[in-house]
């Protein structure tokens, strides 16, 4: 369906944490990957997203930094949360081959209503999803 149509196949590990905060983190990760819409209002006004060499400051900059990069499928392998922090990791299938990803998410407080900062990692792998 194209880069903004969200016709991307998403699977989740059966052992994935299904707590409320972990589910919020997964929704944020899928939004950052361009696999789904980023949850409305989740970004703090001064949110900072560091993704590789790029740094996006502010909600509009984060939204403009979302690029699906020929994304075909996403597998969420892990989602963990504790206090004001959460992490989501898994595998991507892209037109350029398989990749691993991880999003480290820091919320403004333990209620996980707003994201203060995100650090994202992604790299190629030889193992497909």
Say what each PLM segment does:
Residues 1-33, 45, 129:
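Short, low-complexity N-terminal intrinsically disordered segments enriched in polar/charged residues
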Residues 1-13, 64-129:
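A beta-strand edge to alpha-helix "cap/lid" segment located at domain peripheries
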Residues 25, 31, 47, 86-90, ...:
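Small-side-chain structural scaffolding
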Residues 27-31, 41-43, 105-107, 113:
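Broad hydrophobic/π-residue packing in well-ordered secondary structure
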Residues 35-82:
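A solvent-exposed, acidic/Ser-Thr-rich amphipathic alpha-helical stretch
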């Amino acid at each position: 369906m194209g880069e903004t149509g969200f016709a991307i196949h998403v699977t989740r590990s059966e052992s994935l944490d299904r707590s409320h905060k972990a589910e919020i983190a997964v929704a944020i990760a899928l939004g950052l990957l361009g696999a789904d819409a980023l949850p409305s209002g989740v970004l703090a006004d001064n949110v900072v997203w560091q993704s590789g060499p790029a740094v996006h400051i502010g909600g509009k900059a984060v939204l403009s930094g979302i690029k699906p990069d020929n994304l075909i499928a996403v597998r969420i392998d892990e989602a963990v949360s504790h206090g004001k922090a959460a992490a989501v990791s898994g595998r991507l299938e892209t037109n350029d081959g398989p990749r691993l990803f991880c999003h480290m998410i820091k919320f403004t407080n333990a209620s996980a209503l707003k994201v203060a900062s995100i650090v994202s990692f992604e790299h190629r792998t030889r193992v497909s999803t």
